[in-house]
Swiss-Prot record:
Residues 1-20 are annotated as: Disordered. The keyword Hydrolase applies. GO terms for biological process: phosphate-containing compound metabolic process. This is Soluble inorganic pyrophosphatase 5. It catalyses: diphosphate + H2O = 2 phosphate + H(+).
Length: 216
């Protein structure tokens, strides 16, 4: 010990008022009063909806990780890693304060130059609709562009995109679940009109859901 004297540690005095253990129910009730926001329910859809609207990004462009919203906590969670070698061709997320028949917010594929971190939100414009059937259930996707991206903000119709871009999008959704033995069918892309109608319908469904919740 290099000649140093080893001191014997003195016994610590017991605290007169020990810290109580946190009760999980109390902690949960406190969290409901916190400033943390739920991206589905607390984020506004935007004054320009259903044409221009906010989108919460769940999955970044180029990612092989399938993130999704955890509806209970509002956090973005890892659902799975894609079973195939494909990656998401564009940023993918949902429109806040919308609701579809599958009890999820409406899905959006946002075309823009750069990948966006999961959990961020951006402004987008609907330019088309991709009708899709996932394992026998309707699962349509809104095709949109980021209105704050100078390369894409002028696009208002899906027909303005290169045909190859649309082929890439279609092929991704046709193939990304094949190795899971899950069947996905993608129909022909539709114009902005049906996309805007689908968003408005999902906004109306969400409003009905909120009213029903408040009445209970």
């Amino acid at each position: 010990m290099n000649g140093e004297e080893v001191k014997t540690s003195q016994p610590q005095k017991k605290l007169q008022n020990p810290t109580p253990r946190l009760n999980e129910r109390i902690l949960s009730s406190l969290s409901k009063r916190s400033v943390a926001a739920h991206p589905w329910h607390d984020l506004e859809i935007g004054p320009g909806a259903p044409v221009i609207f906010n989108v919460v990004i769940e999955i970044s462009k180029g990612s092989k990780v399938k993130y999704e919203l955890d509806k209970k906590t509002g956090l973005i969670k890892v659902d799975r890693i894609l079973y195939s070698s494909v990656v998401y061709p564009h940023n993918y997320g949902f429109v806040p304060r919308t609701l579809c028949e599958d009890n999820d917010p409406i899905d959006v594929l946002v075309i823009m130059q750069e990948p966006v971190l999961p959990g961020c939100f951006l402004r987008a414009r609907a330019i088309g609709l991709m009708p899709m059937i996932d394992q026998g259930e309707k699962d349509d996707k809104i095709i949109a562009v980021c209105v704050d991206d100078p390369e894409y903000k002028h696009i208002t119709n899906i027909n303005e995109l290169p045909p190859h871009r649309l082929s890439e999008i279609r092929r991704f959704f046709e193939d990304y679940k094949k190795n899971e033995n899950k069947e996905v069918a993608v129909n022909d892309f539709l114009q902005p009109g049906p996309a805007i109608e689908a968003i408005q319908y999902s906004m109306d469904l969400y409003a009905e859901y909120i009213l029903h919740t408040l009445r209970r």
